[in-house]
Amino acid sequence: MKHVVFFSGGACSYCAAKRVVEKFGKENVVLLFTDTKIEDEDCYRFIDEAAQKLDVKLIKIADGRTPFEVYKSQKFLGNNRIAPCSHILKQKTAKDYIFSHYEPQDTVLYLGLDWSETHRFASPRRNWQPFKVEYPMGDAPYMSKVDMLEVLKADGLEVPRMYKMGFAHNNCGGFCCRAGQGHFAKLYEHFPDRFAYAEAVEEDMRQALGKDISYMKRSVNGIARPYTLKQLRSDIEARREIDLFDIGGCGCFVDGD
């Protein structure tokens, strides 16, 4: 039996991979990293060191485009409801690889969702049929994100810097079209150049498509309205109140688009 762990570079996917190795041995375990080409450089460092620590094969695959290039080619700006980047760069790229290299009858796929996300388990299982999908971190002993980061430290791995900066995940260099105000505010704080590029793409597509579109929406008098990164930046710089608890974030491999 072959065991393929979707390895995002996150703490949960590392702990999931570690449980798979402990249960089945390292010989038939593979870590599959699907690169969006905008990952933080420290994410690449972490996935390499994690694979070495677990002593398992690491396979890196990529469509070759970035999320922003996908938005432009699709003439559609990703947002918190529909993320073409997730569908094309993550799900389709991974499916093309999995279906051409493995057989459902002797392969199990593993995702790094934990016990607090059981409501998200059904969608990947449906999307990946006829392959079997399991969630090692959904089982006891149950661990929090803090617990998982402690596992990294105990294993001698440097915690990815995105976590140290307060990001909820270690994907896409801090960008995510599903992110909320709080997440994008953190991107603006730590990576202003990345924020500026995401803002420029958003503005370019608004002009090119002639539509009032944005990555985010904000509720005004109970009505959800587009809220651009340009507006968010203006609010931050003017010290106007924003919703720092609006995190949103990564649903790649989880939400079917």
What are these regions (language model features)?
Residues 1-257:
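Nucleotide-activated chemistry modules centered on ATP-dependent adenylation/adenylyltransferase
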